[in-house]
Amino acid sequence: MKIFIDTANVEEIRKASKLGVLAGVTTNPSLIAKEGRDIKEVIEEICSIVDGPISAEVMALECDEMVREGIELAKIHKNIVIKIPMCEEGLKAVKVLASEGIRTNVTLIFSPLQALLAARAGASFVSPFLGRLDDIGNPGIEIVTQIAEMFALHGIDTEIISASVRNPMHVLDSAMAGSHIATIPYNVILQMVKHPLTDAGMKKFIEDYNKAFNK
């Protein structure tokens, strides 16, 4: 399973990139708004740091405007993937953009059937939201498992991006469920690095070394 980072914070992306684990980035209007910067400027800088799919979301709600925005965003860099919300107008836009050779990531997926429709419309990626489903008492990982099984059964090559990831267990569950990608906040990536026994082991090694050599 590939690891993307879910942020528009350039410094977080730069730090995570240095770990050598990033294969892509997902952004959304809320994340970019937090940065208080021009969207094109932010996306260009992100593309200069990570050589992989960079999801940039349209703001429009009508197909024609989604397509127009998508085409403009795609001009920023060859790695841009256009993020489209799951809705009727969104599916229409995905079909048009796919016919133009522009990759899309259909977001706000909350059911396997939504994922199937998005894939058949031509989406390159679908993004089921784990955390938000958990919030309403529906285990988010269940739909990731169902989508992965359905895509494998029918030979669908659309990639699954586990999104709305809140903790390391979401990442582990996604990997075991067959998700192709998990897009993860920076703080969760850092949590994945840590384990109490790793820290204790490092401390013990240093103590033993210093004791042996009287340091």
From Swiss-Prot:
Biological role: Transaldolase is important for the balance of metabolites in the pentose-phosphate pathway.
Protein name as it appears in the record: Probable transaldolase
CDD domains: Transaldolase_FSA (cd00956)
Main location: cytoplasm
Recorded family membership: Belongs to the transaldolase family. Type 3B subfamily.
Signal peptide residues on this chain, from the entry's feature table: none
GO cellular component, one term: cytoplasm
Lineage, highest ranks first: Bacteria, Bacillati, Bacillota, Clostridia, Eubacteriales
Record-linked PANTHER family: TRANSALDOLASE
UniProt pathway: Carbohydrate degradation; pentose phosphate pathway; D-glyceraldehyde 3-phosphate and beta-D-fructose 6-phosphate from D-ribose 5-phosphate and D-xylulose 5-phosphate (non-oxidative stage): step 2/3
Gene3D superfamilies (alphabetical): Aldolase class I (3.20.20.70)
KW Transferase (keyword) present: yes
Species annotation: Clostridium perfringens (strain SM101 / Type A)
InterPro entries with a match to the protein in the record: Aldolase_TIM (IPR013785), TAL/FSA (IPR001585), Transaldolase_3B (IPR022999), Transaldolase_3B/F6P_aldolase (IPR004731), Transaldolase_AS (IPR018225), TSA/FSA_arc/bac (IPR033919)
Localization: Cytoplasm
